[in-house]
Amino acid sequence: MSRIAKQPIVIPSDVSITLIGQMVIVKGSKGELKRLIHDSVLVKSVKSCLVFSSRINSSVKGWAQAGTARSLVNSMIHGVTVGFFKKLKLFGVGYRISINSSKNLNMSLGYSHIIEYVLPFGIFVESISQAEIIVKGINKQLVGQVAANLRAYRKSEPYKGKGIRYSNEIVRVKEAKKK
């Protein structure tokens, strides 16, 4: 049995949750998110709490899905109230990132051309400097995926430490080959 699924989610006063079959719709001050919950999970709204359980009590997979569903809905509630962000930093001579007028990113990462990245709907980027950006949004998965996609254009390499990395990421620089 999942310990996470047994914990109820307390619904904040500024969030409204609608349950339509297996669809959970969460509305808050920052926006609205929808998610389809697995068929083996039963979601109930009791007072100002959401309770998750397995439809078949003896099913281990049902309880595992209930724990996953609870975590996903909890992230949705956090997203529509506070939001999520990932901070990225660029390390390297001449590496720059800028936001153009159509809210797309232009990245100069040492290639012979400038990379233009089109932001998906619901993702916002804030530029702190030419070498730092913050990816923001209400969908945790989408914010993480966009940050990972941006990082994939030039991952930090271990010899000089050049590339794009998360603000809390530590890159261990290797020693150069000796003669």
Curated annotation (Swiss-Prot):
Database matches in PROSITE patterns: RIBOSOMAL_L6_1
UniProt entry tagged with the keyword Ribosomal protein: yes
GO molecular function, a single term: structural constituent of ribosome
Top-level taxonomic group: Bacteria
GO BP annotations listed: cytoplasmic translation
GO cellular component, one term: cytosolic large ribosomal subunit
Entry keywords, A to Z: Ribonucleoprotein, Ribosomal protein, RNA-binding, rRNA-binding
UniProt-listed InterPro entries: Ribosomal_uL6-like, Ribosomal_uL6-like_a/b-dom_sf, Ribosomal_uL6_a/b-dom, Ribosomal_uL6_bac-type, Ribosomal_uL6_CS
Xref: Pfam families: Ribosomal_L6
Subunit organization: Part of the 50S ribosomal subunit.
Family to which the UniProt record says this protein belongs: Belongs to the universal ribosomal protein uL6 family.
Function in brief: This protein binds to the 23S rRNA, and is important in its secondary structure. It is located near the subunit interface in the base of the L7/L12 stalk, and near the tRNA binding site of the peptidyltransferase center.
Descriptive protein name: Large ribosomal subunit protein uL6
Native species: Buchnera aphidicola subsp. Baizongia pistaciae (strain Bp)
Gene it is expressed from: rplF
